[in-house]
Amino acid sequence: MWEKVIETIAYLKSKGLRVDAIGWQAHLRINSLSKEELDYLDYLIDWAHTNNLEFHITELNLWVQDEITDLDSIQNVQSNIYQKLVNKLISKKNNGVIALNFWGLKDRNGRQKHNKNILSIYDRNLNPNPCLETIKSCFNNGE
């Protein structure tokens, strides 16, 4: 998919049109961000910065297909995934603009079978989820 995005951006720029950024809607699953996926993300961010584009991760959340029976386990997975992602962004901060946005602030039910539960940085009562502390820790350690 991203190769088509890169081709499209190159085409638009060749026509003299302005393109400022690439955005990735990061609706992640519990098996997201393998080493291969992180390596490709690394390539994509570098490509964006080399081509004077900002790189934005938008709509970050975790989609859980099944009913959550072990919330602690899922929150641990969420924290690990977010840690990988945030550390990747921090590693690129001196190369160009990067941005991180969330898709909603609190956990909620989804309306489709692939996202029965949508987890964010706060629980349904707006108490911080463990991943929020993980994100803060990444930023504090990445300065």
Label for each model-derived stretch:
Residues 24-35:
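Surface-exposed cleft-lining segments at the edges of enzyme active sites
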